[in-house]
């Protein structure tokens, strides 16, 4: 299955609310396997949300940085 993956890295600096955003297309049956290429352990996953439209969102803290990975099915 193809997904649009959006990786957001939140800036922790005060007065700078911009975040780094990376968009890519991935082909996988399990978005969590793709996520594990970016993080070290499953313990870094804070929560996982599955929306009715099939979108899977992971909130993680990796190396002290808060990140969000969104996988939206590409119909």
What do these predicted ranges mean?
Residues 1-2, 55:
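Short, surface-exposed beta-edge/turn micro-motifs
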Residues 41-75:
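Short, mixed-charge low-complexity intrinsically disordered segments
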Residues 29-47:
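A short, charged, amphipathic alpha-helix used as a generic interaction element across diverse proteins
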Residues 5, 30-35, 67-75:
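Hydrophobic alpha-helical membrane-spanning segments
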Residues 2-32:
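N-terminal acidic leader/helix
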């Amino acid at each position: 299955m193809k997904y649009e993956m959006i990786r957001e890295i939140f800036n922790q600096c005060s007065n700078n609310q911009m975040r780094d955003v990376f968009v890519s297309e991935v082909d996988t049956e399990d978005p969590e396997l793709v996520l594990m290429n970016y993080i070290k352990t499953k313990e870094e996953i804070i929560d996982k949300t599955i929306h009715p439209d099939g979108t899977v969102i992971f909130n993680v803290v990796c190396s002290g940085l808060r990140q969000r990975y969104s996988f939206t099915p590409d119909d």
